[in-house]
């Protein structure tokens, strides 16, 4: 996938950010969307303790050439924030909700831009649907055992064994 130069000057209706809410797994998921759905899609997964708001300046720039989707994960931003008794705030569960969210808005082929807390969620999406992910762009993605356990279990078990032997 090539990434054309961005033109921040263009500001037509295709680059206007749309603010929406989608009901997924009993939760209201808030998201920002811009660009034409006929273009390649980039899904932006935010960090902790942030929300899709962190991408407010990036979304219009990307939307000149891409369809951009940035959701607030459950417990963040304008999405529902159920109590820990009502919702399992694990990376596995967050990834499951985000997977169902993307299905519900008919996004089935996309690149992911992952940052911080969004990295373990994005990697789980990739493990579940490698055929859907066209590219992974990471910015300061979390790289600790809890966040990457299922990823490292598939990719580099010797790395985990070396880490355990040092402790």
Predicted regions and their residues:
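Flexible "cap/lid" subdomain of the alpha/beta-hydrolase fold that forms the substrate-access gate
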Residues: 3-29, 34-41, 69, 76-113, ...
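Surface-exposed alpha-helical interface segments used for non-catalytic interactions
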Residues: 53-56, 60, 96, 123
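Serine-hydrolase catalytic-loop signature spanning alpha/beta hydrolases and amidase-signature enzymes
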Residues: 38, 49-57, 68
């Amino acid at each position: 996938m090539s990434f054309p130069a961005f033109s921040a000057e263009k500001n037509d209706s295709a680059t206007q950010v749309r603010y929406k809410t989608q009901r997924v797994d009993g939760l209201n998921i808030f998201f920002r969307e811009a660009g034409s759905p006929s273009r390649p899609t980039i899904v932006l997964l935010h960090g902790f303790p942030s929300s899709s708001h962190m991408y407010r300046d990036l979304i219009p720039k990307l939307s000149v050439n891409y369809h951009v989707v940035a959701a607030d994960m459950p417990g963040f931003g304008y999405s529902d924030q159920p109590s820990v008794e009502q919702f399992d705030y694990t990376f596995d569960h967050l990834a499951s909700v985000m997977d169902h969210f993307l299905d519900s808005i008919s996004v089935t082929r996309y690149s992911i831009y992952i940052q911080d807390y969004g990295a373990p969620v994005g990697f789980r999406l990739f493990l579940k649907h490698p055929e859907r992910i066209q590219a992974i762009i990471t910015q300061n993605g979390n790289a600790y055992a809890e966040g990457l356990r299922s990823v490292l279990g598939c990719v580099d078990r010797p790395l985990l064994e070396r880490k355990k032997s040092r402790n």
